[in-house]
UniProtKB/Swiss-Prot annotation:
PANTHER family xref list: GLUTATHIONE S-TRANSFERASE (PTHR11571), GLUTATHIONE S-TRANSFERASE MU 4 (PTHR11571:SF137)
Gene: GSTM1
Family stated for the protein in its record: Belongs to the GST superfamily. Mu family.
Residues involved in substrate binding: Y116
Enzyme Commission no: 2.5.1.18
Residues of the GST N-terminal domain: 2-88
Species, as recorded: Macaca fascicularis
The protein, known as: Glutathione S-transferase Mu 1
Keyword check for Magnesium: no
Amino acid sequence: MPMTLGYWDIRGLAHAIRLLLEYTDSSYEEKKYTMGDAPDYDRSQWLNEKFKLGLDFPNLPYLIDGTHKITQSNAILRYIARKHNLCGETEEEKIRVDILENQAMDVSNQLARVCYSPDFEKLKPEYLEGLPTMMQHFSQFLGKRPWFVGDKITFVDFLAYDVLDLHRIFEPKCLDAFPNLKDFISHFEGLEKISAYMKSSRFLPKPLYTRVAVWGNK
């Protein structure tokens, strides 16, 4: 039986998960929920099912794989990654996985806070000011490695791709000073399964966020 991935009909927190499902050639189907328009942003499609799915912590996204019912986007990523040995092998690799997993989520959340804020126009210049340093840290962490953990791809490369791509959309020039990050993105998008997915009708590059967001909601 295919796994079921449940999420809003947006890119959001499901982007890295969808990419990983495709890369691993996993059998899955999507349950997409639609949020209503302003001013109410009706969530009844999701709320009507929220407590009926047997989830311990009902939330979106969720993944149901037989008796396994998982929420929290990084827990979902790790679950898929463990099936395919994509969590790092040595202690050093696992440390790098853990660091980047959390760093990518922090940075992604920082951008989301700005994009969802009613004060978006005030917050954007300050965020852009700190962006070069943020990208520099990613660049230094990657170094000359082909993937963020080393020679082999791991699930955190999917998270890193997502967060770097989000920032590239937010500020198209933000990676210009970091050729290794641009190479990483090209390398990732050039993977056979990823490239095929991005050309398919299943691919959902936008909207980046829900309709509640000030930026990235279309």
